[in-house]
Amino acid sequence: MEPRTVAEAVETGKEDVIMEALRSYNQEHSQSFTFDDAQQEDRKRLAELLVSVLEQGLPPSHRVTWLQSVRILSRDHNCLDPFTSRQSLQALACYADISVSEGSVPESPDMDVVLESLKCLCNLVLSSPVAQMLAAEARLVVKLTERVGLYRERSFPHDVQFFDLRLLFLLTALRTDVRQQLFQELKGVRLLTDTLELTLGVTPEGNPPKLLPSQETERAMEILKVLFNITLDSIKGEVDEEDAALYRHLGTLLRHCVMIATAGDRTEEFHGHAVNLLGNLPLKCLDVLFTLEPHGDSVEFMGVNMDVIRALLIFLEKRLHQTHRLKESVAPVLSVLTECARMHRPARKFLKAQVLPPLRDVRTRPEVGEMLRNKLVRLMTHLDTDVKRVAAEFLFVLCSESVPRFIKYTGYGNAAGLLAARGLMAGGRPEGQYSEDEDTDTDEYKEAKASINPVTGRVEEKPPNPMEGMTEEQKEHEAMKLVTMFDKLSRNRVIQPMGMSPRGHLTSLQDAMCETMEQQLSSDPDSDPD
C-alpha cells in the first residue's frame, strides 16, 4: 500500500479504515530499509499524522500497530524530523516504560508495546543527532538501567532485554555525557557485570555452559559493547582495591567468554567483543587470565594453565586471515597478548615458543611464509601505523625487548620502524623487568649465522660484482654519476641524509654534525671565554 493511501485513510478519522490501512502498510514494508524518493513527501505527511496522534495518546488496542508504522518510517532518514520533537520522544519513552516523568508509566506495561517503542527509539537515536540530544536530556539511561537491574528478579522477554541493551549501547556510543553518567552516577560497570554473569549462566555452584545459546549470545554481545563504551575513557591510572576486585571479577567472566563457543556462527564475533573489553581493563587486573588451575585437558606450561592464551592465539590467527579493517581486527588482541607477555614471564615464554620458535629456515625472508611469525612480521610494514606498531611491539616484547634478538627474528629492515621510534637504532635494551631468557640457537642457525644479511634476516646469495671487468676510469665515472644522482635527490628534498644522535635517534645529517661540533667545542678547554 502506498504511503499516500495510508495518509488519506488516517485523515478520514475512521478507526476501522485507519487500522486496516496501517496493518496492510506494515505487512508490506516490514522488511523495507530503502525507500523510493518519489514518495518522500507522502511519507513525511504520513509521519506527521502518526506523530500527532502518538503525542495525544493511543488506545491500548491500537498501540502495537501504530508503533510498527512509526518504526518503519523511522528507518527513512528523510522522515525523521516529525519524530524528533521533545513531545514525540517523550511519548515513545512512556510507551517503552523508560520515561522519568512522574505518573507517566503504566503499572503493568504491555511488553509488545514496550518492544515496538524501543525499536523506534533505537532507529531515531541511531540516525538523528537531535534524538540523541533529547534522549540524553530526558535521562532515558536512568530508567533503562533500572530495568536492566531487574533482570535477575523478574522475567522479561528476550527481545525487550536485547533492545534495552541495544538502546544503551547506542546512547553510550554516541553521547559522551551518557557514558560518564552510566559509569559514575549509575555504577554501570557493576550493574552490567552482574547482568553479564546472569546472561552467561555463571553460578558459584556449577560450571557454566560450554555452548552459549543464540539469544544469550546476542544479549551478552550488547552488554560487552556497552561495557566497552563506558570503560574506554574512564579507567585511567591506578584503581582502588574495591574497583580492582570488580574489574578482576569482570576479567574472570571475559576469560570464560574467550574460551566458549556460541550457537550458530557468531563465536568469532563474540570473542572479538570480549577481547576488545579485555583491552580496557586495568593492566594489573589481567592476572586473572592465569588463575585457572591446570587440569587433564588444559595446556600447561611452567605449571600455569595457558588455555586462555591458547584461545587468544587461535583468535589472532583467525583475524589475521582477514584482509580489511585490520586495525579493528588484530590490534586489540595483539595489545592484550603484549601486556600478558610483558607482565607474566610464563606467558611470554609460552607465546615465544608458539610465535617465535627456534630458527631453522635461514634462507627465507622473515615476512615470507604462512607461519604466525611470518604474518606478524608482514604487519610490521603495514600502511596503518597502529597495526604495524602493535605487531612490532608484540614481537619485541616476546624477544624480551632485546634489540639483537628482535633483529634476528624479524630482520633489521622490518625492525627499523620500532627501533627508530624507541631510540634503539644503535642497539641496546630499554629498561624493563625481564629475566635473562636463554635464546637457544638451532644448528642450522649457528652454521649460517655469519652469512645472514641482518637487513633482510636471511642468507643471501652472493651477488655478482657489478664492477667486474671495469677499468679504474670507468669505475670513477660510475661513482661520480652516483654522487650526482644523490646530490640531485637531496637538493630536491626527495631524500634527506640522516645520521644517528648520541641517544640512538635518527636525525638529519646536518643536525648531527652541528651537535657533534657543539660537543667538541664544549669539551675543548681552549674554547672557554676569557
UniProtKB/Swiss-Prot annotation:
Q: Which domain of life is it from?
A: Eukaryota
Principal location: cytoplasm
Name the Gene Ontology molecular function terms of this record: G-protein alpha-subunit binding; guanyl-nucleotide exchange factor activity; protein folding chaperone
Q: Which organism is this protein's natural source?
A: Pongo abelii
Q: Any keyword 4Fe-4S?
A: no
The record's subcellular locations are: Cytoplasm, Cell cortex; Cytoplasm
Phosphothreonine (modified residue): where?
440, 442
Q: What quaternary structure, including any partners, is listed in this protein's UniProt entry?
A: Interacts with GDP-bound G alpha proteins GNAI1, GNAO1 and GNAQ, and with GNA13 with lower affinity. Does not interact with G-alpha proteins when they are in complex with subunits beta and gamma. Interacts (via C-terminus) with RGS14; the interaction stimulates the dissociation of the complex between RGS14 and the active GTP-bound form of GNAI1. Interacts with NCS1; interaction is favored in the absence of Ca(2+) and myristoylation of NCS1 is not required.
Gene Ontology BP term (one): G protein-coupled receptor signaling pathway
Job description of the protein: Chaperone that specifically binds and folds nascent G alpha proteins prior to G protein heterotrimer formation, promoting their stability and activity: folds GNAI1, GNAO1, GNA13 and GNAQ. Does not fold G(s) G-alpha proteins GNAS nor GNAL. Also acts as a guanine nucleotide exchange factor (GEF) for G alpha proteins by stimulating exchange of bound GDP for free GTP.
Q: Can you say what this protein is called?
A: Chaperone Ric-8A
Keyword entries, A-Z: Chaperone, Cytoplasm, Guanine-nucleotide releasing factor, Phosphoprotein
Share the record's PTM remark: Phosphorylated at Ser-435 and Thr-440 by CK2, stabilizing its interface with G alpha proteins.
Q: What Gene Ontology terms describe where this protein resides (cellular component)?
A: cell cortex; cytoplasm; plasma membrane
Task: List residues, modification Phosphoserine.
Answer: 435, 501, 522-523, 527
Q: Which Pfam families match?
A: Ric8 (PF10165)
Q: Which family is it part of?
A: Belongs to the synembryn family.
Tell me which PANTHER family the record gives: SYNEMBRYN, SYNEMBRYN-A
